[in-house]
């Protein structure tokens, strides 16, 4: 997808750099690849933020100003996975503290030292909008602007590797949205 091209290239470059250093210098770098992140300190700008923080702000402002109908980009049918940022931090600590014998399985010449970090759960954007509206308290109508893009139809990481090692996200999406909204309010109102 064109809008994510530079980001994708940067991610691939990071993975390849880790792999090359491991082979050439005997390092033991792992590239932890997260799914869509959200949480404290997020960017809630309506023009250049990711979908979840943008929805928090858009629905909050609609509620506060009494707007009865809002329009959301796309069809709402795209599927996404979300991970609370604190969970990514915990996943990285988990990986850093893996026993040597489990860590050794990551390092070979046939596979890059990459591990996906996600929840393994996805939902459609239309369901995400309902969850955010519920947390924010927006009771108006939502319409879909089909002239705007949905983006990639589905973004779900295969997180089986980290799950099989025993790691699981601690913060579910409903709880995470509530915590993100609290963060938004503390920053928005100041």
What are these language model-derived features?
Residues 1, 9, 47-50, 65-67, ...:
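A generic fold-level signal
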Residues 1-38, 42-47:
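Catalytic helix-loop patch of NAD(P)-dependent Rossmann-fold dehydrogenases
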Residues 12-19, 52-57, 90, 126:
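Conserved active-site helix of classical SDR/Rossmann-fold NAD(P)-dependent CH-OH oxidoreductases
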Residues 13-16, 50, 54, 71, ...:
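Active-site phosphate/pyrophosphate-handling residues
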Residues 19-24, 56-60, 97:
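Alpha-helical segments that scaffold the active site and NAD(P)H-binding pocket
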Residues 37-39, 51-52, 88:
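Conserved sequence/active-site signature of Rossmann-fold short-chain dehydrogenase/reductase
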Residues 61-190:
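C-terminal substrate-binding subdomain of Rossmann-fold SDR/epimerase-dehydratase oxidoreductases
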């Amino acid at each position: 997808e064109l809008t994510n091209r530079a980001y994708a290239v940067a991610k691939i470059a990071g993975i390849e750099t880790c792999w090359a250093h491991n082979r050439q210098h005997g390092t033991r770098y792992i590239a932890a690849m997260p799914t869509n992140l959200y949480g404290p300190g997020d960017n809630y700008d309506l023009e250049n933020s990711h979908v979840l923080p943008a929805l928090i702000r858009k629905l909050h402002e609609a509620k506060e100003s009494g707007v009865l109908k809002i329009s959301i980009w796309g069809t709402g049918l795209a599927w996404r996975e979300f991970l609370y940022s604190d969970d990514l931090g915990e996943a990285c600590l988990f990986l850093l503290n893996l026993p040597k014998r489990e860590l050794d399985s990551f390092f070979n010449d046939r596979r890059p030292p990459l591990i996906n970090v996600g929840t393994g759960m996805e939902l459609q954007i239309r369901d995400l909008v309902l969850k955010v509206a519920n947390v924010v308290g927006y009771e108006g109508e939502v319409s879909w602007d089909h002239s705007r893009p949905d983006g990639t139809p589905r973004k779900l990481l295969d997180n089986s590797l980290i799950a099989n090692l025993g790691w699981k996200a601690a913060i579910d999406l409903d709880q995470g949205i509530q915590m993100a909204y609290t963060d938004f309010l503390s920053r928005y109102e100041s």
